[in-house]
Design a protein with these regions (language model features):
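Short glycine-/polar-rich loops that comprise or flank the Walker A/P-loop
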Residues: 77, 181-182, 364-367
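Electropositive, glycine-dotted interaction segments
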Residues: 91-247
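Conserved P-loop NTP-binding catalytic core
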Residues: 40-110
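Short acidic, glycine-rich loop/turn motifs
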Residues: 10, 81-89, 119-121, 281-285
Length: 428
């Protein structure tokens, strides 16, 4: 599934945030605004779909996530995801969403109050067909291709219809139901990547070597080279484009003794292996290869992120979030870095966050969602008007400022005229 957009409302300080995804999408705002809350809101929304009924109840009562801003108190959580998917050789646009009432005190009962699923052929003139329609009083689904969305289905107050329908193998949109229940999101917010390069004989259960959330990078690279050598060579090539002095990457396996899993309890969350892996880098300026852990912080993080992106297709990840990708990266390197990331993407999309003015200069304006407060403490994000992109650049040049510096000066000024540039009404 190729994710196209998400809508989040009633999560921490987020109010009706609609993010439309390009290959790369950037959330740009001042510090302590709510950029990370958007990423957490997406993670929460997709995790809620896959969670058990008991876990859903706990999630609906998480007091750390319930809006406490005075203008948002009592607001329900809403989540919608829009995706493109191919079925029988045709591409369909799918909209799936749900809404629930937070459990704000012990006497309240958490409850899903709305849920819907609709699809259409992704062609001009096509209309959506309703497949799921659920309110607080009833839940219905479309049981046949020729029927209406009127078949009743019994669900628990904290159970989603899209979960219940996983057992309905005979419905004609069963594949879409399966895909919605298995969408994956990966958040990369490790500003210090050093721990990912250390030799480690411990493997967490349930996480394979080729999964995007595996933590032992040398082991991942060893498996990538062994099973997907073309992807391994691609990784080496793009990394060398960013760091031309790197001539080669070398990963070695070392056998060790003492990996006795029989002594571990059955419920231990990890297993021990009899091998460790070390990643080396051959630099044209050095007499011999060095352990990758000796590379700079920026070089280590860039390599880790490129690896995760290449793994995204094997891990069926729809969206990768990267916080502050410019961290420890020189501005000129960042421009090439973003270009390479864009080229590596298949069906996966990237969303990044930043509070750095210079990053704006290296991004396409259409990628950027600008965060602003129309109400104190409430986070909203808006894209540029088509005319606003050019106007912002011209106005910045008049003040002899970069576009990023000028944009952030406006964000810091309570008397700004951002509605001249953004798709919003500041006074609304």
């Amino acid at each position: 599934m190729k994710i196209q957009a998400v809508l989040i409302d009633g999560f921490k300080n987020l109010s009706d945030v609609k993010i439309t995804f390009d290959n790369i999408t950037a959330l740009v705002a001042l510090n302590n605004f709510g950029k990370s809350n958007v990423l957490s809101g997406i993670d929460f929304g997709l995790a809620f779909i896959k969670a058990s009924i008991d876990d859903k109840m706990e999630m609906m009562a998480n007091s750390n996530l319930i809006p406490i801003n005075q203008s948002m108190q009592g607001r329900n959580y809403k989540f919608e995801v829009e995706v493109l998917t191919e079925e029988a050789g045709q591409e369909y646009r799918v909209q799936y969403g749900y809404e629930f009432a937070w459990q704000c005190d012990e006497d309240e009962v958490p409850e899903i109050v709305q849920e819907y699923l609709r699809i259409k052929l992704d062609e001009k003139g096509q209309k959506y067909t309703q497949l799921i329609s659920r309110t607080a009083e009833s839940a219905m689904y479309k049981s046949s291709e020729t029927g209406r969305c009127s078949s009743k289905i019994k669900v628990e107050p904290t159970e989603l219809v899209v979960n219940k329908l996983r057992a309905y193998d005979e419905i004609y949109y069963a594949d879409i139901i399966r895909k919605l229940n298995s969408m994956k999101f990966y958040m990369e917010n490790n500003l210090d990547a050093k721990s990912f390069y250390r030799p480690d004989p411990i493997i967490r259960k349930g996480i394979g070597d080729m999964m995007i959330d595996a933590e032992n990078l040398p082991r991942i690279i060893y498996q990538l080279k062994d099973k997907f050598n073309d992807k391994y060579e691609l990784l080496k090539d793009v990394y060398a484009q960013l760091f031309p002095d790197v001539e080669d990457l070398i990963v070695k396996q070392y056998k060790i003794n003492g990996a006795d899993n029989d002594k571990l309890p059955d419920d231990a969350p990890f297993v021990l292996t009899n091998s460790i892996y070390v990643l080396y880098v051959k630099d044209r300026n050095l007499a011999h290869p060095i352990d990758f852990v000796m590379m700079s912080d920026g070089a280590k993080r860039v390599f880790m992120i490129l690896t995760k992106i290449i793994l995204s297709s094997a891990s069926n990840v729809s969206l990768i979030a990267i916080e502050e990708p410019e961290n420890s990266v020189h501005p000129r390197l960042f421009q090439s870095y973003i270009r390479i990331i864009s080229q590596l993407l298949d069906d996966c999309k990237i969303i990044i966050t930043s509070h750095s003015p210079y990053i704006v200069s290296y991004l396409e304006p259409s990628w950027i969602h600008v965060g602003m407060n129309r109400k104190p403490g409430v986070a909203e994000f808006f894209t540029f008007k088509k005319s606003g992109q050019k106007q912002l650049q011209q106005d910045a040049e008049e003040f002899h400022m970069s576009m990023g510096d000028y944009l952030f000066s406006l964000l810091a000024d309570s008397e700004n005229n951002l509605d001249d540039y953004l798709e919003c009404d500041v006074n609304e």
